[in-house]
Amino acid sequence: MKTQTALFSFFLVLLLVATQTEGGILDAITGLLGKRALRNQNFVDYAFDPSLSAADWRALETLLEEY
């Protein structure tokens, strides 16, 4: 019984260490990629152009109808 308890405790600690390490690595990678991805969020500003007239929108709609 003592051996089973010792093995269970050992593997539980090993699992906790592996989970914390994986979380730290994934957090670091996500942080690096996330920061890089967040820098280029201003591309959405170009999606809406207020200078387009209603005729321009109709022309775009007819061009993209069959796409």
Swiss-Prot record:
Q: Which residues form the propeptide?
A: 37-67
Question: In the record, which residues are listed under signal peptide?
Answer: 1-23
Question: What domain of life does the UniProt record list for this protein's source?
Answer: Eukaryota
Chain positions found as Leucine amide? 33
Q: Which family does it belong to?
A: Belongs to the non-disulfide-bridged peptide (NDBP) superfamily. Short antimicrobial peptide (group 4) family.
Any extra remark in the record? Shows a low ability to inhibit hepatitis C virus (HCV) infection in Huh7.5.1 cells.
- Which terms under GO biological process does the entry name? regulation of defense response to virus
Any one GO CC term of this protein is: extracellular region
Kindly provide the name given to this protein in its UniProt entry. Peptide Ctry2606
The subcellular localization recorded is: Secreted
Tissue expression notes:
Expressed by the venom gland.
Arranged from A to Z, the UniProt key words for this protein are: Amidation, Antimicrobial, Antiviral protein, Secreted, Signal
Q: What does this protein do?
A: Antimicrobial peptide.
